[in-house]
């Protein structure tokens, strides 16, 4: 396709600038097309160039860094009104400066105006246009501009080709970019390092790191030595996809090719190793950096500290903090936030508070993440008043609570049986512009279900759906469990049938809830049918599923059916647990078969389990009314 476009470039020259270019510009850009409005604009001053007596050439030399749109238009206006007219070289300087500020539409609009003034493009201005077209995702126009280059008799250079190649890569059209490289070589242009780096980056963005490596190796064969920039995208993709072993191999290959490695490349691999659980390897690589004289920075330390903390090795994370302070590398808010969060998760709230004080002492302002972690710690310790004080503090410091902050507080209220306070906070949340998410609704629905306030729970669920907050599998588990536990199994089955017909992937947990609900509602036969259908649905029953079904069969009777399933679960590779044995022991005791219960107790003990509180209570009750002999109690010890 690209080859065909290259061959047709010359025929497309007349259409290379479309009138619609100006449609994407600002009002100021649109005024350039209107002479009367332009005359009015001539009267106004401009911010960056206050000296009206400065010539446009002096301004071109002195003030084009980070040029603003209004200033660029003012300068362009002065240039087109100068006599004699400036050369195309002068205009190219202005266009280049504007392009560096990423105001690509403005460049294209001004190029059009220059052309209308009779100033012909040169290779440089057309190359700038190609870059702007590519950045604006207007590749057809970029190729048309290339056609104009060829028609005017200019020889496209490597930079021009590289710009087009980059444009194709930006749109994910890497195969076409590779074709253009072939065409470029046919025209006698050797791809340079910029071209290769562009292609490697494009291949990596498309998830084709293997092809990127082949391209690099081919490049070495042609005598073009890759640099650290070339390998960066490949290392990044490898580490993100968990291919840390390959990333390490590539690191060694880079060393063999005498490519200077820096902290950035090492940090990429260290980050990948941390995220995929290879903390010791990450720490070894960190030490290797030190031995090779590669200076570690705050980013490297933060990655490692985060890795250790996420793995629960907060002590190692704290050691690294002390080490970096000793090396005069100042920790930042990320460093402290990671450690504070880790201490909170480990239940070490006091240490987290000490770290908070330390960061304040060092003049480091906590952010929303820091405050939210501390609020989480207070909620876990049931210090809700302190949690609210922390919210007030963060707001006073200009940190807005986010949805996670509110979710933590609402969960804290629910755990403390202050669900009405949680609901009130939920209502106030929207006044702060914070939109509730699935976690928010799940927390409140669960809280009201546990209190038996099903009407409120159902209203919240309906509100959730109407506000287009997507319920997830956890939402349905909470709701179905609440309905079943509160005697509304029919409603639970109705909802279950709907989600079974949906595309949501259901796990064994949700089937356990429904089977248990059916058994409690004396629909054991229906529960059995659903249990037997699980393999056909591609769902494997677990030990808990068997226990629920055995319990249901025990309630329905006869016990022989429960015994058969008990033996079958072992045949199916599911070893019974203490709950399985206790269910059967109580069932046989209730049926008056103490002998069978004794055998099951002996088997239970051999398997390393013990009699639970429910079984002990049943035995004591039966002893007290004479249904069991006192000697039976000795069996339980």
UniProtKB/Swiss-Prot annotation:
It is found in: Mitochondrion. Pfam families: PPR, PPR_1, PPR_2. One of its GO terms (molecular function) is RNA binding. PANTHER family: PENTATRICOPEPTIDE REPEAT-CONTAINING PROTEIN 1, MITOCHONDRIAL, PPR CONTAINING PLANT-LIKE PROTEIN. It comes from the Eukaryota. This is Pentatricopeptide repeat-containing protein At1g12300, mitochondrial. The keyword Transit peptide applies. Belongs to the PPR family. P subfamily. One of its GO terms (biological process) is mitochondrial mRNA processing. Gene3D superfamilies: Tetratricopeptide repeat domain (1.25.40.10). Keywords: Mitochondrion, Repeat, Transit peptide. PPR repeats lie at residues 87-121, 122-156, 157-191, 192-226, 227-261, 262-296, 297-331, 332-366, 367-401, 402-436, 437-471, 472-506, 507-541, 542-576, 577-611. The keyword Iron does not apply. GO terms for cellular component: mitochondrion. Residues 1-95 form a transit peptide.
């Amino acid at each position: 396709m690209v080859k065909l476009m290259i061959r047709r470039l010359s025929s497309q020259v007349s259409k290379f600038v479309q009138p619609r270019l100006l449609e994407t510009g600002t009002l100021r850009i649109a005024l350039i097309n209107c002479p009367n409005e332009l005359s009015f604009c001539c009267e106004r001053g401009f911010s960056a160039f206050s000296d009206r007596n400065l010539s446009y050439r002096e301004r071109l030399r002195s003030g084009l860094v980070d040029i603003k749109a209004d200033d660029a238009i003012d300068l362009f206006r002065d240039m087109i009104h100068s006599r004699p007219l400036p050369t195309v070289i002068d205009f190219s300087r202005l266009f280049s400066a504007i392009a560096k500020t990423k105001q690509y539409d403005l460049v294209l609009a001004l190029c059009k105006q220059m052309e209308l003034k009779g100033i012909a493009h040169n290779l440089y201005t057309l190359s700038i246009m190609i870059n702007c077209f590519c950045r604006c995702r207007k590749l057809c126009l970029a190729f048309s501009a290339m056609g104009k280059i060829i028609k005017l008799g200019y020889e496209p250079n490597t930079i021009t080709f590289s710009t087009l190649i980059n444009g194709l890569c930006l749109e994910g059209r890497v195969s076409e970019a590779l074709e253009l490289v072939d065409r470029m070589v046919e025209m006698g242009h050797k791809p340079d390092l910029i071209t290769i780096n562009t292609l490697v980056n494009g291949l990596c963005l498309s998830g084709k790191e293997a092809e990127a490596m082949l391209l690099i190796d081919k490049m070495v064969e042609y005598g073009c030595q890759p640099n650290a920039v070339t390998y960066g995208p490949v290392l990044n993709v490898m580490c993100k996809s968990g291919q840390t072993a390959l990333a390490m191999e590539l690191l060694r290959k880079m060393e063999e090719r005498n490519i200077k490695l820096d902290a950035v490349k090492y940090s990429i691999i260290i980050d990948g190793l941390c995220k995929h659980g290879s903390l010791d390897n990450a720490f070894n690589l960190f030490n290797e950096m030190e031995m090779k004289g590669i200076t570690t920075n705050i980013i490297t330390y933060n990655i490692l500290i985060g890795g250790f903390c996420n793995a629960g090795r907060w002590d190692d994370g704290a050691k690294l903090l002390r080490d970096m302070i000793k090396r005069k590398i100042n920790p930042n808010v990320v460093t402290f936030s990671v450690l504070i969060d880790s201490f909170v998760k480990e239940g070490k709230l006091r240490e987290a508070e000490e770290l908070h004080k330390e960061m304040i002492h060092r003049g480091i302002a906590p952010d929303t993440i820091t405050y939210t972690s501390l609020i989480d710690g207070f909620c876990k310790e049931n210090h809700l008043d302190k949690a609210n004080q922390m919210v007030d503090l963060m707001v006073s410091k200009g940190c807005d609570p986010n949805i996670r902050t509110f979710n933590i507080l609402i969960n804290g209220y629910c755990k403390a049986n202050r669900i009405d306070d949680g609901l009130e906070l939920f209502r106030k949340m929207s006044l702060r512009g914070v939109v509730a998410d699935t976690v928010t609704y799940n927390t409140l629905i669960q809280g009201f279900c546990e209190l038996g306030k099903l009407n409120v729970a159902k209203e919240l669920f309906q509100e959730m759906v109407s506000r287009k907050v997507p319920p997830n599998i956890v939402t349905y588990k909470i709701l179905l469990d609440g309905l079943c536990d509160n005697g509304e199994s029919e409603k639970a089955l109705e909802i279950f049938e709907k989600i079974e017909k949906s595309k949501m992937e259901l796990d064994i947990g949700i089937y356990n809830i429904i089977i248990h609900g059916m058994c409690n509602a004396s629909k054991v036969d229906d529960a059995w049918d659903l249990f037997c259908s699980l393999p056909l649905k591609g769902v494997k029953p677990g030990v808990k599923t068997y226990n629920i079904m055995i319990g249901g069969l025990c309630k329905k009777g006869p016990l022989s059916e429960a015994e058969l399933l008990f033996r079958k679960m072992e045949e199916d590779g599911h070893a019974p647990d203490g709950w399985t044995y206790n269910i059967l022991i109580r069932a046989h005791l209730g049926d008056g078969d103490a002998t069978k219960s004794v055998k099951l107790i002996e088997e239970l003990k051999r398997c390393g389990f013990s009699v639970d509180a429910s079984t002990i209570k049943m035995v004591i009750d039966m002893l007290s009314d004479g249904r069991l002999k006192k000697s039976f109690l000795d069996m339980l010890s």
